[in-house]
């Protein structure tokens, strides 16, 4: 009996680690198979802590965007891939030191990308919109970005903001 309980608990733990969900009022975000994402590499912190912080910051920003939805509407998103702008390199490779530190170097060729499915639900639970998105912003360094240059994930947030405003334009006009 003890073995069965341990096996069941291990299975539940494995399922939870493969799929992280965040729910806050008008939006629910599920980060699916995060170990297979293209690029969520930290520069100078543990991989686990960096992923948690990155997902939390994007979750909080999506909550902020969803506040503009009409009362009763809920956005459900399942993120299947994330590729942050730039690449992580040893600091010595980019000419800013010779220590063991890493840095994320942002160049125009390393564009931000995010893949997800979404559903926008009405107050009665009916599906108002749904779809699959593979967002990428090839002009991320050239376009207007309302975020401060010191803000984390500013390119990814700007890409999500532009998608949100375009995708839900009709819904936002009604609120």
What is each of the regions a protein language model found here?
Residues 79-122:
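Surface-exposed short loop/turn segments
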Residues 164-175:
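Short, low-complexity, Pro/Ser/Thr/Gly-rich segments in the mature regions of secreted, periplasmic
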Residues 1-8:
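Bacterial N-terminal signal peptides that target proteins for export
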Residues 125-127:
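Residue-level signal for glycine
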Residues 45-57, 105, 109, 150-154, ...:
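Soluble non-cytosolic domains of exported or imported proteins
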Residues 13, 17-18:
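N-terminal signal peptide c-region/cleavage motif recognized by signal peptidases
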Residues 22-26, 31-84:
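N-terminal segment of the mature soluble domain
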Residues 44, 130-162:
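Short secondary-structure boundary motifs at beta->alpha junctions and helix caps
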């Amino acid at each position: 009996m003890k073995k069965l309980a341990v096996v069941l608990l291990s299975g539940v733990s494995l399922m939870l680690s493969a799929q992280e969900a965040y729910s806050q009022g008008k939006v629910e975000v599920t980060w699916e198979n995060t170990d297979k994402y293209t690029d969520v590499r930290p520069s100078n912190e543990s991989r686990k802590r960096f992923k948690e912080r990155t997902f939390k910051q994007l979750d909080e920003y999506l909550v902020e965007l969803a506040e503009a939805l009409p009362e009763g509407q809920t956005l459900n998103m399942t993120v299947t891939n994330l590729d942050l702008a730039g690449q992580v390199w040893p600091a010595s490779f980019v000419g800013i030191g010779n220590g063991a530190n890493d840095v994320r170097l942002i160049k125009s060729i390393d564009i931000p990308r995010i893949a997800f499915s979404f559903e926008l639900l009405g107050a009665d639970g009916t599906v108002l919109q749904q779809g699959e998105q593979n967002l990428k912003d090839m002009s991320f360094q050239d376009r207007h970005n309302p975020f401060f240059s010191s803000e984390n994930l500013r390119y990814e947030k700007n890409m999500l903001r532009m998608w949100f405003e375009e995708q839900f334009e009709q819904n936002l006009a009604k609120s």
